Amino acid sequence: EMDRILVASSNDKATAMLVSLLKETFPTCKTSIAATGLETRRAVGSGSYDCVVINCPLSDEYGNELAEIVCTSTDASCVAIAKSENADILADKLEDFGVMVIPKPLGRQYFYRSMKFVSAARKRMLGIRSENLKLHKKLEEIRTINRAKCSLMQYLGFTEQQAHKYLCLLYTSDAA
């Protein structure tokens, strides 16, 4: 589920519609609003969002560079909404960054399904990231153990097996 979503939109009517659709899709979600690309950059820099929805164009920029920045510098998912005649071109530019591009006019059901897909993809990505962090921690532990073994072998003349056994004894006596 999405907990915090930032809506970047310079059109008040479109902003109200997007907020309404997001509340239908994610009833418990907190929605913040930014009216310009600059406001969006500030909000993204100072807050943690699960997703940033950009209603292209914004008053101070189109929104494609903003979408790239969101995807490359934060953990947030990003959805760009663009006129149907621009959506394919925008998608070609942004999909490799992980931006979901949705064409206007916005269909309620299509928006709902797209946002649910973005949410599921984010959940999956966060699960993979968590697993990756665990593996990095495990790898660092192995490196530390190997450095300890090398020190025992170099300075105390232990064999690799003796160093391993010694470290295992230390570990089990510390755990007890």
Labelled PLM ranges:
Residues 28-36:
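Short hydrophobic/Thr-rich beta-strand motif most characteristic of the beta2 strand and flanking loop
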Residues 15, 37-40, 50-72, 85-86:
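Conserved phosphotransfer microenvironments
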Residues 75-85:
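A short, hydrophobic beta-strand element within the central beta-sheet of small alpha/beta folds
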Residues 171-176:
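Conserved small/polar residues in nucleotide/adenosyl-binding loops
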Residues 64-65, 84-100:
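Alpha4 helix (beta4-alpha4-beta5 surface) of REC/receiver domains from two-component response regulators
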Residues 106-115:
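C-terminal output helix
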Residues 2-13, 18-22, 52:
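Conserved acidic segment of CheY-like receiver
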